[in-house]
Amino acid sequence: YVILGGGAAGYSAAAAIRERDKTGSVVMISNEPYLPYNRPMLTKSLMADLTEEQIAMQSKEWYEEQNIHLILGKEVTGLDTEQKEVLLEDGTKLAYTKLIYALGSECFIPPIPGHEQEGVVAVRRLADTRKIENMLPKVKHVVVIGGGVLGLEAAWEMKKAGCSVTVLELAPQLMGRQLDEAAGEMLKLISESRGISIHTGVQIAELEGNGNVTGVKLGDGTSLPAELVLVSCGVRANTQLAQAAGLEIDRAVVVNEKMETSVPDIYACGDCAQFKGVNYAIWPQAVEQGKVAGAAACGDEAVYETVPAALSFHGMKTALFAAGDNGKNPNLIYRTAEFKDLGRKHYQKYYFLNNRLCGVILIGDVSRMAEMTQALENHALYQEIVK
């Protein structure tokens, strides 16, 4: 078994294979020099000086005990589906019987003039957080481009580090795909009460500077000073290798419920996979799909059950949880129940279709998070939720 990628999906696939097949050879290849680690931790702990060991999913010993061979810090440059071989940048060829394609995704950096300057960083790898930590002593002003979960987490970390922080969101509201307008507004108020300035519905004209970034110029001509610009504009699946090898690609590598691709003996999972037209690129989905791909590669009859897309955010001295469909389909008629406490900055909103729960937003008090995740799966009735 050869696994391409050392993220959540690749790691979960390796573990699932070993549970079923104790003797087959398992090789895992990553282009980062570190053991597979918990990527969502990066923005949550920009300032925590984390070591590789602290965010690793397993210790080096675990891979040795499980007899999983790691090839770290190497790029895969080719995939030959006829010969069933993987080619590495140093010319090494590895034969596979079953291949798991889990190459994840990269940050999308919009083509804004000036984006290639020093001081413009997308937080995607451990190396990026190290870079930010090294720059910080010289940084007073930070601009974060993107008002999603990761952007706001990064903004809060920078604020705690003593910088003045501005968040720019191109959409008319924060987290518009997951939150309704009132919740987006509440999140903006909370952020601003913590001293983070938020601009929604903006256009970015250019990143100013002379090789080192010095500011961000908006479409209306306003200029914001910045020695550090963090980009958090979503991700794009890594599909180049799969495409060159002739696998079916849409926005990501197309898979069925067993995570099989269009080519026999090749499975894909995680951020780089797309199932039933959907690619959420979220951590729980990568873990789940990895397990299924690993099981299927061993000939097991596992099937992927869609993970409900949920979003949780901790920071700004508040917490947020949103899951399901929060009134996003203009052709449907939703019933809603809303509870608001502006003083304590608490907000709860429940969305129902045909009297059954389809979406939840909690801000401030998220103690019902586990209960609501269950209720969404069970399509709970209105009466059961709104007591």
Annotate the PLM regions.
Residues 103-161:
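Glycine-rich dinucleotide-binding loop and its adjacent helix/turn
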Residues 4, 94-106, 145, 224-234, ...:
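Short hydrophobic core segments
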Residues 23-25, 64-66, 70-90, 94, ...:
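A Rossmann-like FAD-binding core segment of flavoenzymes
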Residues 1-69, 157-178:
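Beta1-alpha1 glycine-rich phosphate/pyrophosphate-binding loop at the start
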Residues 216, 220, 224-248, 321-387:
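C-terminal catalytic lobe of FAD-dependent flavoproteins
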Residues 34, 52-56, 141, 150-206, ...:
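Rossmann-like dinucleotide-binding cores of NAD(P)H-dependent redox enzymes
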Residues 116-140, 208-217, 222-296:
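FAD-site-proximal beta/loop scaffold in flavoenzymes
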Residues 6, 19, 272-369:
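Mid-to-C-terminal Rossmann-like scaffold of FAD/NAD(P)H-dependent oxidoreductases
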